[in-house]
């Protein structure tokens, strides 16, 4: 076999006159009678190869038979393309290689789709033939970026004294939150391991063990319904540190992210990042992961309108609800249908209606304007900085409904109005989360992040008096409206950890059975510690400018958690189940 001397995509005019050996795939073959042109592709790019009977007749004969995706080894001489035939769309467009020798290393069937960017092919087909899909340049660029980002993370953390330590993949099931993937133990019949949803407990134990600075780029597993863009197995950048406070972690993580963006995609990220409280995020943006690339802030006007004659506002305000609004600048031209569509849109998030004021130079147009005195109307318009040409939208409801409805309306309007700038990376931290929230279905408190998150020191007394007012030492990093990382300072005292377990409804026996080893470890000199975990797939997706994490994972699952290429999951042999002492009890529908 002819061994490669150069990659296809690296040839330039300075290589003219050199003899080279290339290995790659046939992207396209064109027969121009006396000459055959082959675009040869490898992971670095494409170069044009010319087969001429005058240079080598045998090579020319071989080229007559090659087809798309044949694997070739070619020896030839680099020449400048004749003037006027250069291809400015290729980095190699000033040169071509005249072949003097060729070997067909393998033939190929006609692929089910073209191996090129921008193809309109059903994703199921792409996933079924993932080995072909991954040949496309945009997919290879995404995986190269993933590699560069992972390397940058490792380089940065190594320089700052972190050790990469692996934690177990086969661990204990603690059914809190999402479902575990269970693995039966053949050697311990009737018992199961769980695949980790996160190395959370192990990384805290490593801090107890005195490792001080740990990290891992680690696979995690969650057996959950794959709503939106989720995967049953995903990758985290997992980090934990001892003898630090919240500021230490947040500032170091800003440095790390800035370093990764610079190294992987050449983008300068400004630090420090903006910080806002959870309360401010929910009030102004209707979400705890706001996109700050555009304005459209939400304003609470409850106090202004609680006593107006408009009964909807009055009733909601006096029942403990809120009235919030946002100003859609320059949208006074929206049609009746537009307004009806937006009302239906907020209805998807629980809102019972969408009130509006259309501001024109002459008047305020609105079915609700007649219920307001002139000074009340003026105060309301001023509160939202309204001007002629704007529409002011209002939702009156419970705080959580108003936040969700207007938060989603804000994003919807920004997309529709083209307010979201492309190629901009807007980072922020959301801090001061509540430690707990109340689950009305389960009738108990649940941890907003996880039960190992430490409360603010000054809020410790409130754990007994009013748990919902306790703030957490938690912090989420948000990029362009996507949460890319979440972390906290951890509880490191047994008494506080036991109190936390009790608050979320774990009995003393349950806490001991599930986390007894951890509680015991806390009695042997546990340092103050904290950490963070970044969703690596989502981070790379945003860096690559892609719409789905499936585009930055080599072998992703579908939304029904299947691998179309290998056919997983699959039915296993009875012998295997017998060895594991497992009987399968399928739902009736699946047995038929």
Swiss-Prot record:
Transmembrane segments: none
Region (Aspartate): 200-203
Localization (cell): Cytoplasm
The keyword NADP is assigned to this record: no
Residues under site feature: Important for tRNA non-discrimination: 32, 84
GO biological process assignments: aspartyl-tRNA aminoacylation
Keywords associated with the record: Aminoacyl-tRNA synthetase, ATP-binding, Cytoplasm, Ligase, Nucleotide-binding, Protein biosynthesis
Catalytic activity, reaction form: tRNA(Asx) + L-aspartate + ATP = L-aspartyl-tRNA(Asx) + AMP + diphosphate
Primary localization: cytoplasm
Record: residues binding L-aspartate: 176, 222, 449, 490
Matches recorded under CDD domains: AspRS_core (cd00777), EcAspRS_like_N (cd04317)
GO cellular component: cytoplasm
Any GO MF annotation of the entry: transferase activity
Annotated function: Aspartyl-tRNA synthetase with relaxed tRNA specificity since it is able to aspartylate not only its cognate tRNA(Asp) but also tRNA(Asn). Reaction proceeds in two steps: L-aspartate is first activated by ATP to form Asp-AMP and then transferred to the acceptor end of tRNA(Asp/Asn).
Family to which the UniProt record says this protein belongs: Belongs to the class-II aminoacyl-tRNA synthetase family. Type 1 subfamily.
SUBUNIT field: Homodimer.
Entry protein name: Aspartate--tRNA(Asp/Asn) ligase
Source organism of this protein record: Carboxydothermus hydrogenoformans (strain ATCC BAA-161 / DSM 6008 / Z-2901)
Name of the gene this protein is made from: aspS
